[in-house]
Every structure is written in C-alpha cells, then in structure tokens.
Curated annotation (Swiss-Prot):
Top-level taxon of origin: Archaea
Subcellular locations according to the entry: Cytoplasm
Swiss-Prot/TrEMBL GO biological process terms: DNA-templated transcription initiation
EC number(s) from the headed UniProt entry: 2.7.7.6
UniProt GO cellular component terms: cytoplasm; DNA-directed RNA polymerase complex
Species of provenance: Saccharolobus solfataricus (strain ATCC 35092 / DSM 1617 / JCM 11322 / P2) (Sulfolobus solfataricus)
Gene: rpo4
Enzyme class: transferase
Name this protein carries in UniProt: DNA-directed RNA polymerase subunit Rpo4
Primary localization class, coarse: cytoplasm
NCBIfam families: PRK14981.1-5
Biological role stated in the UniProt entry: DNA-dependent RNA polymerase (RNAP) catalyzes the transcription of DNA into RNA using the four ribonucleoside triphosphates as substrates. This subunit is less well bound than the others.
Length: 113
C-alpha cells in the first residue's frame, strides 16, 4: 500500500481539478464520487486547464490572493458586477474600475466561445 504525502497545497481552478481527475480516472482510480465530480466539473468548465493557468498568472499582477485568482479562473466572470462579487472576498485591497476591466479583458482572452 502506497502512502500519499502532501508537499504543497494550492487553490486551483475547476479546469485544473478536472484535468487531475481525468488522470486519476484513466489510471484506474475511478469511483462513483470521482465520476460525478468529473461530470460536474465538465459541465461548469469555461476554459481549459492551460488557459486557466494563464489567467491565474496574468491576474497575479492585479489580484494578490491565490484563492480569489482561482475563483476568477474557475467562474470566468465577464461583467464588472460578476467580478466585483468575487473581489469582495479580498478585504485587503480596493479594486478600481480599471483593475476590474483588466480582469475582464484577461478572462475574455482565454474563455471558451
């Protein structure tokens, strides 16, 4: 029996979680819970894992909190109201209208059409 050790912990967007689950399922580690989680992630995914990682990287200049960047890359909001409803979680920073527009522009570059 092999042991699993957690070396690091990070917030990840839905599409990255889906990619990791795909790898687990393909290696034979499937269960009903994993399959249902995969199906859910597949239904809400708005960009692929690579694009989501790029969104997170580009957002790091604007949004300092990793969890907020992961949520933005998961949900892919495209209006200022949607972005503001997520950014409210970051109580350490006030975002300008320019910041919000930059976030929307970054997300729109990578979102699935």
């Amino acid at each position: 029996m092999s042991s699993v050790y957690i070396v690091e912990e990070h917030y990840i967007p839905y599409s990255v979680a889906k990619k990791l689950l795909t790898d687990v399922i393909r290696s034979g580690g499937s269960s009903n819970l994993l399959q249902r989680t995969y199906d859910y992630l597949n239904s809400v995914e708005k960009c692929d894992a690579e694009s989501a990682q790029k969104v997170i990287e580009e957002l790091s200049n604007i949004v300092s909190r990793e969890d907020v960047r992961a949520i933005l890359a998961s949900i892919c909001p495209t209006t200022s109201d949607e972005v503001r409803s997520i950014l409210v979680m970051d109580t350490n920073k006030t975002y300008t209208s320019e910041d919000i527009q930059k976030i929307i522009d970054i997300i729109r570059k990578y979102i699935k059409s």
